[in-house]
Amino acid sequence: MKQYTVAILGATGAVGTQMLECLNEQEFPVGKLKLLASARSAGKTVEFRGEQVAIEEACPEAFEGCDIVLGAAGDDIAKELLPEAVKRGAVVVDNSHAFRMDPEVPLVVPEINADDIKWHHGLIANPNCATIIGLVPTWPLHQLAGVKRMIVSTYQAASGAGAPGMAELEAQLAALGRGEEIPEPRAFAAQLASNLIPQIGGVKEEGFTSEEMKLQNEGRKIMHLPELRVNCTCVRVPVLRSHSESITLEFERDITVEEARAALAAAPGVKLVDDMSAEDAHDRFPMPMDTSDQDLIWAGRVRRDISNPEAACGITFWCCGDQIRKGAATNAVQIAKLLCE
């Protein structure tokens, strides 16, 4: 099997660290690994498959000889450095927002639109975490009955703000447990522990946030549905890891709850957990504590939308997924594996 020179840009962050684990778990054919990060991390070492790999400072020259680059840096760094990797012959799979809506860049969820990889020009974008988690279980239902409208509420964990967000929540919870004053928030707009923050991202048109618009804009591109209508509310919740979403879908054609459950049970990347009569809550419905450090999106609470006058055309469900894994690192490594086929 061919071996590839793989680089991770942003290798020391939460997503970059998870990408490294995913490369190993998915037995990716890595011949040589390059870990790229800021100057302050350069020189440190990280173990990969029994060997110590030194972290290098990220710069254009660091991409020389790379076959595949996994991007886990912020938008500004991605815009500055990843085109340099493409110039040097690498194919880039980028997790930032920088290139997602560029019409020349495929935006890919392998379970949905893997064929879009074929028209890449050196760059492939990884969608937003909430987009991936919501669309993976939506897709098999769309294939069944043709989705035309989505109403979504997201409950997004601290992990969405990376390692600093998780550390901040943990520090706040510890302070609460000791009865101490909560440290001043840095990663979030307000204290997250024992609280909900109904804003993720900057405010865009008509009062929606940038995070809320991503699901519509990215969903249209990924599912090839330019007329898809999405009304989304995104809320940061005091959960360490794994996002949850309540999703109501309106379809072109009639669909029964039984058909929806069967489609979800058979769908790649989805685990159906939907037995409200089960004794154990973990068997009744998905919860973020169960999906943390898992690659599958768990879906459950499947029921018809009783608010829709066309009741046979509406389904509501609940899903949970690990933001760092399938919402970011796992999806990127899955794309990279497709490049090797």
Where are these regions (language model features)?
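Glycine-rich beta-alpha junction loops
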Residues: 39-41, 129-130, 154-161, 196-203, ...
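Oxyanion-binding "anion nests"
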Residues: 193-240
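A glycine-rich, Thr/Ser-enriched phosphate-binding loop motif common to dinucleotide/cofactor-binding enzymes
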Residues: 124-135, 207-216, 327-331
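C-terminal active-site/capping subdomain that shapes the small-molecule cofactor and substrate pocket
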Residues: 228-341
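Generic solvent-exposed, charged/amphipathic alpha-helical segments
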Residues: 20, 216-220, 261, 265
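N-terminal Rossmann-like NAD(P) cofactor-binding subdomain of oxidoreductases
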Residues: 1-192, 227-229, 262, 290-291, ...
